[in-house]
Design a protein with these regions (language model features):
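Short, basic/glycine-rich phosphate-binding loops at helix/coil junctions
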Residues: 7-20, 68, 90, 155-163
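A broadly conserved amphipathic alpha-helix scaffold signal in soluble, globular proteins
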Residues: 32, 67-74, 87-90
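Gly/Ser/Thr-rich beta-alpha loop segments that engage phosphate groups in nucleotides
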Residues: 27, 57-63, 95, 104, ...
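ATP-binding N-lobe of GHMP and related small-molecule kinases
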Residues: 1-56, 74, 78-83, 110, ...
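Residue-level signal for inorganic ion chemistry
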Residues: 1-3, 27, 61, 127, ...
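ATP-dependent small-molecule kinase catalytic core of the GHMP/sugar-kinase superfamily
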Residues: 78-191, 204-242
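Glycine/serine-rich anion-binding loops at beta->alpha junctions
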Residues: 47-76, 191-205
């Protein structure tokens, strides 16, 4: 996401995404919402380069919206606190607050009640099945039972985590199930799961070398990439403390 301040109040998207009207773009919505609530007379030009697949369950749109709020908080010299931006971001989507929070977190509610947690350093092999999963359709599925026992802190550990959506998505999208099956036969993984509502799936590794060996063995017909886990958002200091 690249942002350029305008002296007028216009909010302009320079890089529209095919199939997504500008008014539906979360970066545009974030900028307009912050402009309205802050009362600033400034505007912004937004350039967006998508590096991860849409409909992959990776939170790309929410992350872009959070980045827009954090950056404009500084560029427009608003000096809002992290908590204020998180509350505003919740209007854009349940996943936006965690990206503003800027730390690994245990989430409750719809994702807005966040508590920081410490995670060990890790690398992730992310596979991208060639399907687009509709989050709305998955949550509306009769196969989603919603009867999982809630997990609380302090007993929580990553090993206790479970994605209730995974079995529903695998039933509706066999390609997702096939990619998960391939990851589960790998050695030296510490976790294999689906991202959010899919379609992407991932395997966690403690070392970069193990992750790169797994990436090198991805078969023809599958594609993926490596990422390193972060414990702190690089823009975490773009807000006022308190």
């Amino acid at each position: 996401v690249s942002l350029t301040i305008r002296d007028d109040s216009k909010i302009q998207l320079n890089t529209p995404i095919i199939g997504v009207p500008a008014e539906k773009n979360l970066c545009v919505q974030a900028a307009r919402l912050l402009q309205k609530e802050s009362g600033t007379s400034l505007g912004v030009e937004i350039s967006l380069e998508k590096l991860i697949p849409m409909g992959g369950g990776l939170g790309g749109g929410s992350s872009d919206a959070a980045t827009t709020l954090l950056a404009l908080n500084r560029l427009w010299d608003l000096n809002w606190s992290r908590e204020e931006l998180m509350e505003l971001g919740l209007n854009l989507g349940a996943d936006v607050p965690v990206f503003i929070f800027g730390e690994n977190a245990f989430a409750e509610g719809i994702g807005e009640k966040l508590k920081p947690i410490k995670l060990l350093p890790a690398w992730y092999l992310v596979l991208t099945p060639p399907v687009h999963v509709s989050t709305a359709d998955i949550f509306a599925s009769k196969e989603l039972t919603r009867n999982t026992i809630p997990v609380k802190i302090p007993p929580f550990s990553v090993g206790l985590g479970h994605n209730d959506l995974e079995s529903v998505v695998c039933l509706a999208y066999p390609q997702v199930a096939r990619h998960l099956e391939w990851l589960r036969q790998l050695n030296r993984t510490t976790m294999v799961a689906m991202t959010g509502s899919g379609a992407c799936v991932f395997a966690e590794f403690i070392t970069e070398s193990a992750a790169r060996m797994a990436l090198a063995s991805v078969p023809l017909g599958m594609s993926g990439f490596l990422v390193q886990g972060l414990d702190r958002h690089p823009m975490q200091d773009y807000t006022r403390r308190g």
